[in-house]
Amino acid sequence: MSRVAKNPVAIPAKVEVVLSSDNIAVSGPLGKLSLPLSGDVAIERDGDNLTFAAASESQHARAMSGTLRSLVFNMVTGVSQGFTRKLTLLGVGYKAQAQGANLNLDLGFSHPVSHKMPDGVTVQTPSPTEIVLTGADKQVVGQVAAQIRAYRAPEPYKGKGVRYADEVVIIKETKKK
């Protein structure tokens, strides 16, 4: 059995979990998330805890029990606390501005870049060089952050570009004559 799946998922008081044979739905103050289930993992509810176990002894079922436990834990955390991803812009003239569900970026191209936010993700720009993404779905928040970073990834010689706030960019040494 997966070691991750041995730990139960605690359900906070303000979170509601609906478990059916082919779907699990988690709703809370920050939204509602659902996940389709396969028959490889058996989920049991014991009061305020969810326990996960492999339905069969196959390697795939044991691996999926830990994966599903992590996904459900992220869903419960997302609808109760939410997830945040911060990006910083480094470079002369690089700036970001949030306008409703759009993020307008000036990244040194000949044209401005506009990125539309998907449902469930909000964007804020506390300063022109900072972007804060928040949402209930960890996968979607991370995907949007990766898409924004891909517009101008940090280059290795000066480090200019869009980077995660906690990212360390290793700067290469320039060529010596």
Curated annotation (Swiss-Prot):
The UniProt entry, under InterPro entries, shows: Ribosomal_uL6-like (IPR000702), Ribosomal_uL6-like_a/b-dom_sf (IPR036789), Ribosomal_uL6_a/b-dom (IPR020040), Ribosomal_uL6_bac-type (IPR019906), Ribosomal_uL6_CS (IPR002358)
Cross-referenced Pfam families, in alphabetical order?
Ribosomal_L6
Q: Which domain of life is it from?
A: Bacteria
Entry keyword Metal-binding: no
Keyword annotations for this protein? Ribonucleoprotein, Ribosomal protein, RNA-binding, rRNA-binding
One BP annotation, GO: cytoplasmic translation
From the UniProt record, which GO molecular function terms apply?
rRNA binding; structural constituent of ribosome
Q: What's in the GO CC field?
A: cytosolic large ribosomal subunit
Q: How does it assemble?
A: Part of the 50S ribosomal subunit.
**Family, similarity comment:** Belongs to the universal ribosomal protein uL6 family.
The record describes the protein's role as: This protein binds to the 23S rRNA, and is important in its secondary structure. It is located near the subunit interface in the base of the L7/L12 stalk, and near the tRNA binding site of the peptidyltransferase center.
The entry's protein name is: Large ribosomal subunit protein uL6
Q: Which organism is it from?
A: Methylobacillus flagellatus (strain ATCC 51484 / DSM 6875 / VKM B-1610 / KT)
Q: Which gene encodes it?
A: rplF
